């Protein structure tokens, strides 16, 4: 049975980490996804903007993506209602085994989080996985299922644009992406306490897959800039989704795009819910550097790997200062 895992975290020791300083404002690119379905000139400009955002920032916000506000709010409500269930109900999904199809855990046990609880489960294809999902709250499967299907659609649009922008063509890997892994990670962060020195809810890390699409109820996500390692807070723009590059897109692009290091900080005003939808190929399908992006001037930079390889990597490296993509880099002679 495939595992419900997620990211490999950069920080191994969380005690004594100083509270983060407020990052300077540095607006993130905002992409109007509707331009992808307009005329060819509009699509070309949108493709250019998406790939540029991936190259320079590793992330962007998307608007006009076709997911209704009611669908997004419904998913956040379903997540919030799940975390409000009794401890006994939530513990039905608790497991130390990352190879479970659904898993609930808290920062007191998982050795990774600093202050959060989470529920992770698979979502694509929905008919294969929804039977593992919670039946409480009563509308969970309906609301989260609708949102999962919609984010899978958006991920396909984005991947087509990115692959086109890389010169690989919009249909590159299309069938494999359609049948690929999607897993949904629901995160619940408490309100920051004035007595608590450590304000970080989730340590710096990058995600495993091609793309992560994130919905957040309130600000708390921070992203690291490629050029200077500075942090920027990601606003919770009503109706917008946050998108960032994962480790396997860095591999596929042969290093043209870099996976985004990000973290979660506790909100001083309220508790926070986020829903991360992470997209990649199927469990055993290896991702390699695209041959079209490898030549004598651009040698292959990474080894191929699959999601199963990532799961094998996790147990021995969970608490080390290392990201998964770092283990895939080919040493230059």
UniProtKB/Swiss-Prot annotation:
Organism: Oryza sativa subsp. japonica
Tissue expression from the record: Expressed in roots.
Function: Involved in melatonin degradation. Catalyzes the hydroxylation of melatonin to produce 2-hydroxymelatonin.
Keyword set includes rRNA-binding: no
Binding positions for 2-oxoglutarate per the UniProt entry: 272
Protein name: 2-oxoglutarate-dependent dioxygenase 21, chloroplastic
UniProt GO cellular component terms: chloroplast
Induction of expression: Induced by cadmium.
Family of this protein: Belongs to the iron/ascorbate-dependent oxidoreductase family.
Keyword field: Chloroplast, Dioxygenase, Iron, Metal-binding, Oxidoreductase, Plastid, Transit peptide, Vitamin C
GO MF, any single term: metal ion binding
Transit peptide: 1-43
pH behavior: Optimum pH is 8.0.
Gene name of this polypeptide: 2ODD21
Enzyme nomenclature, EC number: 1.14.11.-
Domain Fe2OG dioxygenase: 180-281
Cellular compartments annotated: Plastid, Chloroplast
Requisite cofactors: Fe(2+); L-ascorbate
Temperature dependence as stated in the record: Optimum temperature is 30 degrees Celsius.
Reaction(s) catalysed by this chain's protein: melatonin + 2-oxoglutarate + O2 = 2-hydroxymelatonin + succinate + CO2
Cofactor note: Binds 1 Fe(2+) ion per subunit.
Stored PANTHER family: OXOGLUTARATE/IRON-DEPENDENT DIOXYGENASE
Main location per the UniProt record: plastid
Lineage: Eukaryota, Viridiplantae, Streptophyta, Embryophyta, Tracheophyta
Sequence positions that bind Fe cation: 205, 207, 262
């Amino acid at each position: 049975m495939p595992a419900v895992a997620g990211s490999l975290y950069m920080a191994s020791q969380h005690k004594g980490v100083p509270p983060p300083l407020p990052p300077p404002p540095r607006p993130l690119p905002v992409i109007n996804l509707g331009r992808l379905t307009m005329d060819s000139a509009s699509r070309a400009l949108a493709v250019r903007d998406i790939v540029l955002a991936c190259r320079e920032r590793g992330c962007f916000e998307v608007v006009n993506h076709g997911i209704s506000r009611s669908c997004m709010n419904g998913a956040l409500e379903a997540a919030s209602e799940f975390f409000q269930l009794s401890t006994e109900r939530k513990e039905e999904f608790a497991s130390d085994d990352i190879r479970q199809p659904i898993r609930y855990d808290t920062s007191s046990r998982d050795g990774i989080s600093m202050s959060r609880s989470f529920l992770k489960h698979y979502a694509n294809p929905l008919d294969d996985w929804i039977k593992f999902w919670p039946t409480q709250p009563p509308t969970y499967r309906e609301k989260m299922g609708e949102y999962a299907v919609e984010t899978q659609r958006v991920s396909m649009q984005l991947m087509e644009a990115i692959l086109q922008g890389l010169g690989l063509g919009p249909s590159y890997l299309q069938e494999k992406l359609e049948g690929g892994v999607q897993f949904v990670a629901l995160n619940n962060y408490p309100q920051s306490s004035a007595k608590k020195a450590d304000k970080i809810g989730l340590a710096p890390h990058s995600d495993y897959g091609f793309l992560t699409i994130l919905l957040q109820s309130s600000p708390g996500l921070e992203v690291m800039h490629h050029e200077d390692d500075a942090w920027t807070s990601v606003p919770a723009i009503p109706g917008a989704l946050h998108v960032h590059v994962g480790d396997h897109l860095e591999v596929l692009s042969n290093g043209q795009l870099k996976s985004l290091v990000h973290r979660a900080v506790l909100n001083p005003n309220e508790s926070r819910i986020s829903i991360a939808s992470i997209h990649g190929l199927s469990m055993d399908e290896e991702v390699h550097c695209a041959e079209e992006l490898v030549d004598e001037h651009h040698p292959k930079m990474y080894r191929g790997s699959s999601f199963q390889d990532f799961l094998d990597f996790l147990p021995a490296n969970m608490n080390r200062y290392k990201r998964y993509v770092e283990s895939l880099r080919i040493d230059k002679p």
